Curated annotation (Swiss-Prot):
Organism placement in taxonomy: Bacteria, Pseudomonadati, Pseudomonadota, Gammaproteobacteria, Vibrionales
Annotated disulfide bonds: none
Quaternary structure and interacting proteins, as annotated: Heterotetramer of two alpha chains (FadJ) and two beta chains (FadI).
Gene Ontology MF terms: acetyl-CoA C-acyltransferase activity
Signal peptide region: none
Chemical reaction(s) catalysed: an acyl-CoA + acetyl-CoA = a 3-oxoacyl-CoA + CoA
Gene3D superfamilies, per database record: 3.40.47.10
CDD domains: thiolase (cd00751)
Name this protein carries in UniProt: 3-ketoacyl-CoA thiolase
Top-level taxon of the source organism: Bacteria
Localization in the cell: Cytoplasm
Enzyme class name: transferase
Protein purpose: Catalyzes the final step of fatty acid oxidation in which acetyl-CoA is released and the CoA ester of a fatty acid two carbons shorter is formed.
């Protein structure tokens, strides 16, 4: 495999100029009535205002939404139309489950590398509160048949075949389509397979909340989070509302397992909650950013995606994707100043941390002669992770990118890894650089 270079044909790098997100809110709280498309428009509009860039200069928007809304299937285009951009701005939507905004950022970066555009916006938004509630297959078929009837008798005949259970709403699926397993069940399997104890999971969750709380108190997060005024505009939200500012280890021990009631160790407290929110990043060709006098936050140095089986260890994507991106960039784990891994579950994150250091795993699964290396926990999720901040599926990648770049800048520059697992056995990894 040749060395990956995230550059244009003229050798210019892809710069991330700015990043912004809404506060992340637990399901059915401050954003309970705000659909994902409105969250997306909200954050992109504020991003454009903060960077003081003419919206007409944006040439492409790539945005993602995991929980699709039938009435707005192309969230990216709705954002263009709702934020004052040129109506001719290219816009399309992507989904890679929990790694969606890594994918959208890569798509914009590749458009810049190809010379198709100079400036683009990437990101994602999701609402776990405003959901598409479906109907049973029998009711759906009956409604379709009903639309084709002409007489009252025909209508009554169609309706007579429906029972009360057919009228029950069908909530969105929370399990893998191919296996029927939920993410939580997979996290339980990974905890058992890799010997991740309840105490270790609770300790990571406590660490995540403690570090996130401290980061907010130290003023490190506010600059990348907008103040949102959701309709009917009678209140606002300026901070994430999932973070436990009074987190104690003893508190986690009180919760019962959520997925294996008798023998399990994965609980609601050592997992990330269902969350509403949006995040976006502004990307530019390096030279164009300098022409416009924009301060550059950092650069994308490399990226990789992975796919593995879904029957077991489905959330091991970070280990596979990180191996690929380290190989393609010629870097070692020791070259990194920071490592930020998405915490879908403490069990999943800790299992991946364990596999990073496993020679056996590297030889059997990664095609490496030895492990990638032991993760220095002083570099790992230093501002807390998704367990604390929350996880609006499509927005998490952009949150991680912005948060990591700003922290790298505070530390005087360097290289950082962002990596995430995703449904379907997918994984994502990105190397970011700040000079």
């Amino acid at each position: 495999m040749g060395k990956q270079e995230v550059k244009t044909r003229q050798g210019e790098r892809v710069a991330i100029v700015a990043g912004l997100r809404t506060p992340f809110a637990r399901q059915s709280t401050e954003f309970s009535q705000v659909p994902a498309v409105d969250l997306g428009k909200m954050v992109v509009s504020d991003l454009l205002a903060r960077t003081d860039i003419d919206p007409k200069l944006i040439e492409q928007v790539v945005f993602g939404q995991v929980v699709q809304m039938p009435e707005a299937p192309n969230i990216a285009r709705e954002i263009v139309l709702g934020t004052g951009m040129n109506i001719h701005t290219d816009a399309y939507s992507v989904t890679r489950a929990c790694a969606t905004s890594f994918q959208s950022a890569v798509n914009v970066a590749e458009s810049i590398m190809a010379g198709a555009i100079d400036i683009g916006i990437a990101g994602g938004a999701d609402s776990s509160s405003v959901l598409p509630i479906g109907v049973s297959k029998k009711l759906a078929a009956s409604l379709l048949a009903l639309s084709k009837t002409k007489t009252l008798g025909q209508k009554l005949k169609v309706l007579s075949g429906l029972g009360l259970k057919d009228l029950m709403p069908v909530p969105p699926a929370v399990a893998e389509y191919s296996t029927g397993l939920s993410m939580g069940q997979t996290a339980e399997q990974m905890a058992k397979t890799h010997g991740i104890t309840r105490a270790e999971q609770d300790a990571l969750a406590h660490r995540s909340h403690t570090l996130a709380s401290q980061a907010w108190r130290d003023g490190k997060i506010a600059g990348e989070v907008m103040t949102a005024f959701p309709e009917p505009y009678k209140k606002w939200i300026a901070e994430d509302n999932n973070i436990r500012h009074d987190s104690t280890l003893e508190g986690y021990a009180k919760l019962r397992p959520a997925f294996d009631r008798q023998y399990g160790s994965v609980t609601a407290a050592n997992s990330t909650p269902l969350t509403d929110g949006a995040a976006a990043v502004l990307l530019m060709r390096e030279g164009r950013a300098k022409e416009l006098g924009m301060e550059i936050l950092g650069y994308i140095r490399g990226y990789a995606f992975s796919a593995i089986g879904v029957e077991s260890d489905m959330l091991m994507g970070p280990s596979y994707a990180t191996s690929k991106v380290l190989q393609s960039t010629g870097l070692a784990l020791s070259d990194l100043t920071l490592i930020d891994m998405h915490e879908a579950f403490a069990a999943q994150a800790l299992a991946n941390v364990k596999m990073f250091a496993s020679d056996k795993f590297a030889q059997e699964n990664l095609g490496r002669s030895k492990a990638m290396g032991e993760i220095d926990m002083d570099k790992f999720n230093v501002l807390g992770g998704s367990i604390a901040y929350g996880h609006p599926f499509a927005a998490t990648g952009a949150r991680m990118m912005t948060q990591t770049l700003r922290e790298l800048k505070r530390r005087g520059g360097g290289l950082a890894l962002n990596t995430a697992c995703a449904a379907g056995g997918l994984g994502a990894a990105m190397i970011l650089e700040v000079e």
